[in-house]
Amino acid sequence: MRELDREELNCVGGAGDPLADPNSQIVRQIMSNAAWGAAFGARGGLGGMAVGAAGGVTQTVLQGAAAHMPVNVPIPKVPMGPSWNGSKG
């Protein structure tokens, strides 16, 4: 087996780019939302900051989970067939 060069490594799933790693993106987004929540909750003191940070983390987790949920799209009923033969088209 031969060793891959840098160009081939970059083509394989974003190797070599730590900012494109999905896990680091999730951690960065959670930390960012926790910081924003803590900043908005700062008027409530330490307790408000904790509640704000928890709300920011919860928002990130729920939005990430909602993105992976199946989409329920109803299929419209289209009349098929002629109505003169009783097919209710």
From Swiss-Prot:
Residues 1-15 form the signal peptide. When avirulent E.coli transformed with a plasmid encoding the genes necessary for microcin production, secretion and immunity is fed continuously to broiler chickens it significantly reduces the S.typhimurium load in the intestinal tract. 44 of 57 reptile-derived Salmonella strains were sensitive in in vitro killing assays to the above strain, suggesting it might be used to reduce pet-acquired Salmonellosis. Transmembrane segments: none annotated. The keyword Secreted applies. The keyword Disulfide bond does not apply. Induction: Induced during exponential growth in all media tested; activity remains in stationary phase, although expression varies depending on the growth medium (at protein level). Stable on heating to 80 degrees Celsius for 30 minutes, unstable at 100 degrees Celsius and to autoclaving. Mass spectrometry suggests 3 of the 4 Met residues of the mature peptide are oxidized. It is found in: Secreted. GO terms for cellular component: extracellular region. GO terms for biological process: defense response to bacterium; killing of cells of another organism. Keywords: Antibiotic, Antimicrobial, Bacteriocin, Plasmid, Secreted, Signal, Virulence. Belongs to the class IIa microcin family. Active against E.coli and Salmonella, but not Listeria or Campylobacter. Channel-forming microcin. Probably neutralized by its immunity protein McnI. This is Microcin N.
